[in-house]
Regions:
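N-terminal accessory beta-strand-rich subdomains and adjacent acidic, glycine-rich linkers
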Residues: 1-119
């Protein structure tokens, strides 16, 4: 399964059999879904995210009303940061808070899959 990363657009393109799965890193932190379907050779942003004023949605950056986690097609949404949809996971911290703020750090693409000890 080829995995291609476009550094200039911060786009991951996974190809498997007859399908493609495409994700992008936005705002240096959030992994968003762009495409899943029939295998394509390259992504030309035909299904790109539309950035428009989200005045009635929570904006993590008060100076950018076009960005809201509540409308972003996140790959792994979390709770407590302005996204009111169901989260992908839940936690409870020692202080009782259920809010988390996970973000993308980096990636590594390896050839093949790693061997699992004992299998």
């Amino acid at each position: 399964m080829p995995i291609v990363y476009d550094k200039s657009r911060k786009i991951f393109h996974l190809q498997a059999g007859d399908t493609s799965y495409i994700m992008q890193i936005v705002k240096e932190k959030y992994l968003v879904h762009l495409y899943w379907g029939r295998r394509i050779s390259s992504y030309h942003e035909s299904r790109r995210i539309i950035w428009k004023d989200r005045g009635f949605a929570p904006n993590p950056d008060a100076s950018d009303r076009t960005f809201s986690l509540d409308t972003l097609p996140q790959e792994y949404p979390q709770t407590g940061n302005g996204d009111f949809r169901n989260p992908a996971y839940g936690i409870r911290q020692e202080n009782g808070s259920r809010i988390s703020n996970l973000g993308y750090i980096g990636y590594e693409i390896s050839d093949g899959k790693p061997k699992l000890p004992g299998l």
